[in-house]
Amino acid sequence: MSILCGVPILECVYCLGCARWLWQKCLYTAGHESENWGLATAEEFEPVPRLCRLILSVYEDDLRYPLWAPPGGYGINPDWVIVKRTYEETGGCATPYMIYLDHDNVDIVLAIRGLNLAKESDYAVLLDNKLGQTKFDGGYVHNGLLKAAKWIFDAECELLRDLVEMNPDYRLTFAGHSLGAGIVSLIAMYAVQNRDKLGTIERKRIRCFAMAPARCVSLNLAVRYADVINSIVLQDDFLPRTTTALEDVYKSIFCLPCLLCLMCVKDTCTLEEKKLKDPRRLYAPGRLYHIVERKPFR
């Protein structure tokens, strides 16, 4: 009798948990997350639009005859492109990228494109991670993204060192979007740890702009590298809020409804304090800038 009486109660609790999870994930406006943050200055945010255009240019096959240029173009000089690597050249170890010597803005930029939905190698990089699998500088990082970051750094560190030494007043900037944002964040951290390989460049000359990055570093590393890495999140962008442990979702695609139910119950019943205390949990890297452009239902 007690079991039968308990069934409706359990169902109600379950439904309330699912409703709360749905509210948080789908209806709760992201503007509330940053409503108490300070406003960014124009000087802080100035590089972002320019670097976004530069990242977009990596998608082009021929920068002299672009096919998908935004209004006003990419704002770059094709003659200042030092190298531009394709999937064939990276061998699937990383997404395509470009090194650009920006004389107008006194900047050496390594820009990496985002996830290519048609490339299996990109998924392999993103899904190559387990909770607490890889340690770095006293914290935890995403295993697949770190391997891609090390591959690019090792491949281009001599070229970057030459550019830094030939242009001692230029900053070294890493910029990327989505999957590429996670990779450049870890490249920046790896570069800070190996500045001797870049001609002993000062830490203050290294910076990173990660547009909609994947969660790739533990909380202590996100804070420690906040002076180097800047993460830009647009409105309700899901990637910086979504765990990178997606292997189970892809492996269980045929029982996705059951998996989502388990996820919402676990998310509802786990205290935020407990999540924050887990040193292995990954977060968006560095200092966060949140762009809020609209309100819900408006």
Predicted segment positions?
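Non-catalytic, mobile gating and regulatory segments of ester bond hydrolases
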Residues: 1-175, 179-298
